[in-house]
Amino acid sequence: QVMRATYGAVGSALGTGVGVLVALLFMAGVYALNRGMILRRVQRDRHEHVDSYGQIFRTITLVVTPFILSTAVYNLSSTVNNSIYTKWYPSLRNLDTVSIYEKYGIFSGQSLTMSNIPIAFASAMASAMIPSVAQLMAARDVKGAREKIGLAVKTTMVISIPCAVGLFVLAKPVISLLFTNKTAEELNLAAALLMTLSLSVIFYALSTLNSSILQGLGKVNTPIINAGISLVVQTVAAVLLLMFTRLDLYSIAIANTLYSGMMCVLNQWAVRRAVGYRQEIVKTFVIPVFASAFMGAAAWAIYEGLYMVTKSMRISVIPAIVIAAVVYFVMLILMRGITEQELRSFPKGYLLVKVAKKCRLLR
């Protein structure tokens, strides 16, 4: 068990470095393929001033540093929670340190990991937003930037809201499906913590997107300041909950959700101030919530029905997830929460439109 944990830690540490190395090699390959064209463009260039390597390095540093600091502050959230719960809390309550570390391992290794999966999709979309928003603002096309931001926020909510509901409703079977070597007690704790964290999926998705939008608008320091404020609020909340309640590890889950919610509100407010932007409410938030509620009810009913017959969580949860996704897709279109044009902007959007038209959901 110790060796497996060690290899897991080594793998997670190596994964980050290998990912960056592969990206660097990919960029080098792209440059090698386009080197001839780049050199020809350089020869045709008529600019007399050429930046020195020092100036180029300084410019890159000034651009990249805020992104690095922002990521560092984001990661501090988990570090602070870890320190509070595993180092300060045991001395406060005179608790066994080994038990505390085991419980926090369940929180960070299972519940938090599962809640981060949907957020990864929002992060990918957020990365794609920076150049497009920056381009529109450079062209002084504020209206175009607002439309782009509005569509990105709506797309993020259409994906993250059902993910949050799905994780809440199917927390235990999903955890059991992916973590097969855990005891029933560990699975129950991980599932309960995942349910507590499910709301943070929506908050993190929106705050991550808005953070990238702000960076695309040139407000590179704003997300860092907002993350710092949210970190202070989270720390105070975690300490107070651990001191004055018996919520134990749930205090950390609640504080984590509060952190993401605070980030979401502050970043959204900053984007609104920067471009005078107001998000449409009904189709972006209300309809996805109602469609997700129907989806959640269907997922729970199908899972419980299949579990009564099969007595297997793993066999029951997969059909429940698939049918729940279909129910959400149908309800979202029937409630007119998404247009054909918006649906085409999704990954495999043209295929989704084709399926919807075949099923007569779209005309």
PLM feature segments, named:
Residues 57-61, 108, 129, 141-158, ...:
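Interfacial transmembrane-helix starts/ends
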